[in-house]
A protein has these predicted regions:
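Bacterial N-terminal signal peptides that target proteins for export
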Residues: 1-7
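Bacterial N-terminal signal peptides
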Residues: 7-16
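Terminus-proximal functional modules
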Residues: 18-191
Length: 191
């Protein structure tokens, strides 16, 4: 009886490993130069069970400036009730304000990139996600740090860390006037 139980346990363990490897995924690649279009396309994909995978901004293979987003979906268990917001601006003050408004509504950070705007600036673009299920959204406090000096950024990151903020990402943005800034995004979630 013990040998039979051990053999059955090994067989179940082996078959569960096979199930993991046989999972299938579907993908949607979204590409556009307009943030409003990207947000609409991401939410349309979310309605079909896709979730955010990754983002990149830059020059496409045909020479245009675009933001590329990969949306992913498990064929067996598609996601449901996700909503996305895409923020993009070359003004850090505006970005901080919009980011905090989204945090107040429970939107969580997914990713960020930089892409060139029609006005010659390099806009920081941030993608946020919120689960639309019945659970109340938790408030998230965001902090945006921006400086042209890396030594200043390190000092500000340490101060934010001491205040309980978790680092999420960093990019170098360029304003329409030609200035470059190191921009870090951090968050603190209310308990």
């Amino acid at each position: 009886m013990k040998i039979y139980s051990a053999a059955l346990g090994i067989a179940l363990l082996a078959s569960s490993g096979l199930t993991t490897f046989s999972q299938k995924f579907d993908y949607r690649l979204l590409a556009t130069s307009k943030t409003s279009t990207m947000e609409k396309e991401m939410n349309s994909a979310a309605d079909a069970g896709f979730v955010f995978g990754s983002v990149m901004g830059g020059e496409s293979s045909i020479g245009g400036k675009e933001v590329l987003v990969v949306m992913t979906k498990s064929v067996e268990t598609p996601a449901a009730n996700k909503k996305y917001v895409l923020l993009a601006t070359s003004k850090t003050g505006t970005l901080q304000k919009e980011l905090q408004q989204a945090g107040d509504e429970g939107f969580e950070y997914c990713g960020q990139t930089v892409f060139e705007s029609a006005f010659g600036g390099r806009e920081v673009s941030i993608i946020l996600e919120r689960n639309q299920s019945g659970a109340p959204a938790k408030r998230i406090e965001y902090k945006l740090l921006a400086t042209s000096k890396t030594s200043t950024m390190e000092k500000e990151l340490r101060q934010a860390g001491d205040a309980g903020f978790k680092f999420l990402g960093v990019v170098v943005g360029k304003t329409a006037l030609g200035g470059k800034e190191v921009i870090s995004i951090l968050q603190k979630t209310e308990k």
